[in-house]
């Protein structure tokens, strides 16, 4: 009986992962969520219907995240696309019970120190939103169009290293997806494998 229960739990976990992965595939509707930002304000994805939205999974403890902030790459993208009325939501899905968890105040302080320019920094302390999107790494990026459809899911760029210098010469998939989608063109690269640190669920 114990073996059966274990096997059933493995099957359920596998099926949940498969359903979550399907839910955030390019062409699918982006899963709805409501999270709290670092100022304590409730933020829903639905608040931004009619706009392009970028989701950035982040964790200050991750060297791959620090690569993009140390180089100024992430802040530069945030500012670049804010000028085009794109909403940028940075999400920390590190579980509240994990040693790497950051309180809202700690996340706000870190983002301010980096010069972050996201529309909002959101705390997903239960990891529910991260799991709904099957987010696997920090950074893991999603581009959602004004209809709520996922247009891109994956790595931020094609330089899979933690070296800040690489960010300046990389092919940036997020910029490419936004540029093409906002011009009414098909997104040429809709999905890639994200690289970085595992999300601490």
Give the residues covered by each predicted segment.
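Short, internal strand/loop/helix patches
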Residues: 105-151
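A short beta-strand-turn-helix
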Residues: 33-53
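Conserved helix-turn-beta segment immediately C-terminal to the redox Cys motif
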Residues: 51-52, 67-91
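Thiol-based oxidoreductase modules, predominantly thioredoxin-like and allied folds used
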Residues: 85-101, 117-127
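Boundary at the C-terminal end of the N-terminal hydrophobic targeting segment
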Residues: 20-23
């Amino acid at each position: 009986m114990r073996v059966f229960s274990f096997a059933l739990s493995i099957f359920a976990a596998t099926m949940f992962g498969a359903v979550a992965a399907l839910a955030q595939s390019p062409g699918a509707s982006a899963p709805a969520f409501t999270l709290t930002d670092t100022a304590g304000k409730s933020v829903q994805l639905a608040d931004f219907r009619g706009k392009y939205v970028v989701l950035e999974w982040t964790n200050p403890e991750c060297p791959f995240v620090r690569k993009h902030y140390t180089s100024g790459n992430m802040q530069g993208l945030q500012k670049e696309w804010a000028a085009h009325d794109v909403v940028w939501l940075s999400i920390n899905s590190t579980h509240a019970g994990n040693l790497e968890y950051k309180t809202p105040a700690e996340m706000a302080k870190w983002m301010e120190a980096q010069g972050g320019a996201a529309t909002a920094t959101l705390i997903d302390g239960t990891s529910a939103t991260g799991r709904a999107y099957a987010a696997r790494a920090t950074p893991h990026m999603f581009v959602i169009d004004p209809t709520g459809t996922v247009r891109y899911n994956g790595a931020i760029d094609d330089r899979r290293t933690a070296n800040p210098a690489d960010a300046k010469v990389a092919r940036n998939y997020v910029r490419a997806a936004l540029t093409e989608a906002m011009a009414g063109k098909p997104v040429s690269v809709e999905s890639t494998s994200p690289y970085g640190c595992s999300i601490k669920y």
